[in-house]
Design a protein with these regions (language model features):
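Generic detector of short, locally flexible boundary/turn motifs and exposed helical patches
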Residues: 1-5, 78-83, 91, 99-105, ...
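Active-site-proximal loop/helix segment associated with metal-binding centers of metalloenzymes
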Residues: 38-99
């Protein structure tokens, strides 16, 4: 599933790597439950600047124009965007979180009980209650940064007949 930095990956690359690109959002049916998977950025509705940027860079025309530029220029643009993002983080700017109503709407439209997403990277579980009284869960994944101290390499493991587990691969390794 495309995220902030890999939205240019296409079907040709995915096929060459043996990957399947997932639409955002995607419903995963596992162990008799419907799980809604999303990058999560489309649900951060209060971050108007980011939504505008997202719309721009996900457009076919922008991507075609970007990929037509020389590699050196594309790398410079990517570094500049990353530097802007890091500066915003360092400034202590508050980021918009997922819009609860939009998340609940997606869950109900897909008949899913749990939304699993990243983007906000504030790992936690959030309970969502609908007007009709049904309860849904939003599970937020951490970001991945192997060079951070300590490394952030956390996953959510789904197993049949067991509750999902958050696993820190930097501590436990693959099991």
């Amino acid at each position: 599933m495309h995220g902030n930095r890999d939205f240019l990956l296409g079907q040709t690359f995915a096929k060459a790597c043996g990957m399947t690109l997932l639409a955002d959002p995607t419903v995963l049916v596992f162990d008799t439950q419907r799980w809604l998977l999303s990058h999560g950025d489309a649900l951060c509705l209060e971050d108007a600047d980011y939504q505008q940027f997202r719309t721009l860079v996900r457009s076919a025309q922008w991507q075609q124009d970007f990929l037509a530029k020389p590699l050196v220029q594309r790398q410079a643009m990517a570094r500049e965007l990353r530097a802007q993002s890091q500066a915003r983080k360092a400034s202590g700017a508050v980021y918009a979180d997922v819009d609860r109503s939009a998340a609940l709407h997606w869950l109900q439209a897909c008949d899913a009980s749990t939304l699993i997403h990243g983007h906000t990277h504030l790992p936690a579980d959030h309970t969502l209650h609908s007007v009709g009284g049904s309860t849904h869960l939003r599970r937020v994944l951490s970001d991945w940064d192997a060079s951070a101290q300590p490394p952030r390499l956390r996953v959510l493991r789904l197993q049949c007949t067991q509750a999902p587990q958050r696993i820190d691969l930097a501590v436990s390794g693959l099991e």
